[in-house]
Regions:
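Polar low-complexity intrinsically disordered regions
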Residues: 1, 37, 201-205
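Basic helix-turn-helix/winged-helix DNA-binding cores
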Residues: 2-112
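Intrinsically disordered, low-complexity, charge-dense segments enriched in Lys/Arg
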Residues: 108, 112-205
Length: 205
């Protein structure tokens, strides 16, 4: 692939290095009204937008999450730190999972660790997950680079030019998409298992 594509990839990988996320210490430990929640999420996750007009979180989204049992209802119209942490998880999950799947994934958290006074707080879970994700970033970048280099070895029988560039880029996109597809399938199988176990536990009650 040509220099422009290589430069684009390097630029993207540099962005990954500085990828912002909601740091555990930045989540306010006070109850917020809905307007304050949407403002907080917009400020914290603005850099993750693909387009400037993209919405991070709206009032309608929050109400729908509550309606679909992803998010416990607010107390006297106020949302706690635990609500905010769940909303961060939902924000990332919704890009790859259905609402029903997100409900299944978050159900154990909302049932066991959401209430105040629980032995293991949701904030502790969030911190642990953030730690894992930061540790994975370097290996993800290495994997993407290796995939790029492998894709650059395709269609070598073609002369250098637009056709070769387009097809090598297509091969790169396909390889990345296949990786996403396989990982998404694994996630869905795990979620199906969680759902099955949950149903069996309900039947025993």
């Amino acid at each position: 692939m040509n220099i422009d594509t290589s430069n684009l990839l390097n630029s993207i990988l540099e962005e990954l290095s500085s990828l912002s996320y909601v740091h555990p210490g930045d989540v306010p430990n006070i109850n917020l009204y809905m307007d304050q929640v949407t403002t907080f999420m917009d400020e914290q996750l603005a850099s993750t937008k693909r387009y400037p007009d993209d919405k991070i979180l709206t009032k309608t989204m929050i109400n729908n999450y509550t309606k679909n049992n992803l998010l416990p209802p607010p107390v006297k119209k106020k949302y706690s730190r635990e609500h905010l942490l769940l909303l961060v998880f939902i924000y990332y999950f919704k890009n790859i999972l259905s609402i029903k799947d997100i409900e299944t994934v978050l159900a154990p958290l909302t049932e066991k660790y959401f209430p105040d006074g629980s032995s293991f707080e949701l904030a502790d879970i969030y911190k642990e997950v953030c730690k894992i994700e930061k540790e994975q970033l370097d290996s993800i970048k290495e994997n993407v680079t290796a995939t790029y280099e492998k894709s650059a070895e395709t269609f070598t029988h073609l002369a250098d030019g637009e056709d070769k560039e387009i097809l090598q880029q297509f091969a790169f996109i396909c390889s990345l998409s296949f990786d996403v597809y396989i990982k998404k399938m694994i996630i869905e199988r795990i979620i199906d298992d969680l759902s099955s176990k949950s149903s069996k536990n309900e039947e025993k009650k």
